Amino acid sequence: MSQQQTGTLRNSMSGSLLLAKQLGFEPKTVIDVGAALGTFNLYETFPDSRHLLIEPIAENEPYLAKICRKLKSAEYIIAAATKESGVFTLNVSPGMVHSSLSENRVTDSSNPYLRNIPAITLDEICKERNLPGPYLIKVDVDGQELDVLAGATEILQQTEYVIVEVTLFGQMYDVMSFMKSQGFAAYDIVDLSYRPTDQALWQVDMAFVKESGHFRRERGFATGEQDIEALNSHLKAYRESFIKHIDTHYSDPVEPEPQVSQAVVGEDYVII
């Protein structure tokens, strides 16, 4: 079934995940880092996978518990995934939407938006809970994605697909460089978000796949006679549409030809 038939937009995370599934990818374990109130397209696209939801904001726990009860095989952890285990300070926004980590522990308990929380690494938790690969990992942790990935270098060896929220005004190129160092290539860009001040592109969800993995078996743009024929037909129509646009909007106006009267020549005069 095509994505047009399902009504799923190709340039969304749902569309990207559905495409991965249509291409034969079935992760054994799906890891949702920064689960918040749930990433439903992960759970709905891969209902038979084992799901691990990691979320640092304790106020979201009741909702994650409801989600996990409905999934075939799922569990959640209230903790922060980062580059090393321990205890970190979480600074939570008043709306419980965003948070940030600090290595300094809280000593003043009067601020309800600052709290100490346990920190884990993905490598450790997967080993501890015997979570099998291949993995699909989604990371959305408000700018600290690199720390999460740094704590996952072992399981990245068994990971085919990684989705990372990146910002064009922050860590985008650092994430791309790190993923390349781990043998991954950029695969997809979805869910574009524009900042309201000037409509500049602010952040995107970026998918990475193994350079030598499942999604890089084909290197050409089109394969097979039918694909090439369809491509050539598309390119021909594309060219014709350009020519039509040029003829309509950029051609010089056609000037009418001058009217020439017929002349009658007499013996001593000319009648026009």
For each predicted feature, which ranges?
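Phosphate/nucleotide-binding beta-alpha loop and adjacent structural elements of enzyme active sites
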Residues: 1-272
